[in-house]
Amino acid sequence: MFHILRLESTVDLSEPLKDNGIIVFQSDKLDLEPSPNLGPTGIDNTNVNLINAKGDVLLHIGIRRRENAFVFNSIPYGESRGPEERIPLEGTFGDRRDPSITVFDHPDRYQIMIDYKTVYYYKKRLEGRCEKVSYKINEGQTPPFSDVLGVTVLYFANVMPRAN
């Protein structure tokens, strides 16, 4: 299933993500220069999120160019975020013309891929199936991606070759 996800928006998936589901966020541009305006937060941050029916952010993937970091976290609805997990941003994107972030939903963790190369495994902290995705940016900043992302939902069983 394909969805259009605009900057500063949240989109309901056609159905909750099932076991071994894959979500691919695709852009048609990549700008890794830090945003010149840090806005009121003081943090250069653009993020995509996987959200359950209760509003919990199951997986937050933040791109902080000024800090040269990907930030991973979970945020229970109405509560504080947990401890951040980080990896370096530099060198992760291979193709600046068609960048992608892919999330493979395993039973106990999320496998995060940048341009289809695994960069991190994030252990699940919250329960529930992903039912929504969002694309956000801190106020007054410029995003590293296009203003509109393509979001594709796939299932491993459907993309794996089968012998007849």
UniProtKB/Swiss-Prot annotation:
It is found in: Secreted, Extracellular space, Extracellular matrix; Secreted, Cell wall. Induction: Induced during fruiting body formation. A carbohydrate binds at H60, R64, N73, E84. Residues 9-154 form the Galectin domain. GO terms for cellular component: extracellular region. GO terms for molecular function: carbohydrate binding. Coiled coil: none annotated. Keywords: Cell wall, Extracellular matrix, Fruiting body, Lectin, Secreted. The keyword Secreted applies. InterPro entries: ConA-like_dom_sf (IPR013320), Galectin_CRD (IPR001079). Pfam families: Gal-bind_lectin (PF00337). Homotetramer. Oligomerization is required for carbohydrate binding. Binds lactose. May play a role in fruiting body formation. This is Galectin-3. The gene is Cgl3.
